[in-house]
Amino acid sequence: LTVSLNTGEWHDFMLEGEGQRLVVPVDIFLFVNGTIIPGGEIVVGEEGRLAGQMMTTPYTTEANLTLYHPDGRSTAIDLPVLEGLPIVNGEEWFQKMDYITSVCSDSTECGGYINRWMGSGNPQFERAAAYFKGHFEGLGYETHMMRVFDHGNPTQPESLNVIAWKEGRNDSCVQGMGAHMDVAPPGSLAGTYEGAYDNTAGTVSMMLYARAFVDLTFECDTFLALWSSEEEGLRGSNAFATNDCDYCLPKDKELKFYINMDMMGISWPAHKANGDPFPYHAWSGPDFDPNEQDVAITDVLDHVHRNVLKAPMNLTIDGSYGSGCDQHWDEHSNLVMDVHEDTFGRSDHVTFRDLGAQTIFHLGAYDDDYDAYHSPTDTLDNMVSEVGGQEELEKSIEFVMWAAMLEFLIADQTPEIRNVGV
């Protein structure tokens, strides 16, 4: 019997014998009872048997495991690694993107969930929100449509969010992940109808995470959210954070961390037409002192990219990118992997950062590096064209989706990640 591992997939295992200790490489993850085990090491207790799962990444190439025996001996276990279908993958992301943004007479082929601008009682937004809510509900999440009217006109809802909750082990804390589902409203010089990059891409990422997280167990109560009104000033996430309702952000629990997905897919490893890689932005916060690391989630951000995914952290281009981080831009302007602590705002992570949560913000290329967002050219076809084909886009989005997912899983089991106000 030959045992192998497939990239990006789950693999069941069973260890027998008290004191047996299994150690795995940094890019293979152990889960017991649905929870990631930090450090990649487990020991069989007095019960004499331990069942769990291993998860590889799409980029795992070797599986060199070591089993340490109670008598001091050890056994090397080298398993072949085969190409698999990752639990979160670019191909499924693209299929869902294509369905949501396509318009045709066959509803099985085209969802037509476009024109999702917020603030005018838009029936297209209502229809899309109901579709997204149904996705989370169908997976078994406690899901709510959150409406807030704060100007007295019910035909112009201030915000309409989709909030999916997953109960954690610890009732005293809360954490979350989200993306805004609204698109820039139409105007004479701006506006979009697909909003493929900004932010159908992040919305679909959240849909895939919800499926991947169904059978996992987290430390804290966890919200997976699709925000409205980001384009009108973060009103959706602010409504969730500041209002009192059964499914709003609880005020009596410690808000530990939040990860935000906005404008996804146009980033390294995809390349521009001139051959340069697109910049890759991922910023942690709060960043109180640009000369010091302020928060523990920065260690998770760096570890995932540098050690687990083995990203080219020192890769540079000749010249300079069009835009990037707030801090350190003078020394980072030509850096492909713009991954560090920073004060950068402009999206829904600011809502939670202002409440003391440690945050990570994933953002693709923007402004001079890719300026199609907030315009009629923000389409899936344009994204494909800009990166040189569908396969390249799928590779690009798959990398950042795995980075954010691993950050979330590891942060969940990192006790040092606390609200900075504690």
Locate each region found by the language model.
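Aromatic/hydrophobic beta-strand junction motif of beta-rich domains
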Residues: 3, 13-19
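Short, hydrophobic beta-strand segments
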Residues: 48-59
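N-terminal hydrophobic or amphipathic helices/low-complexity stretches enriched
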Residues: 68, 72-125, 166, 420
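A non-catalytic alpha/beta surface segment that caps or lines the substrate-entry region
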Residues: 102-167
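Alpha-helical metal-binding/catalytic segments enriched in His/Glu/Asp
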Residues: 164, 177, 182-234, 403
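Metal-dependent peptidase/peptidase-like ectodomains
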Residues: 227-359
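His/Asp/Glu-rich mid-to-C-terminal helical/loop segments that flank catalytic regions of hydrolases
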Residues: 363-422
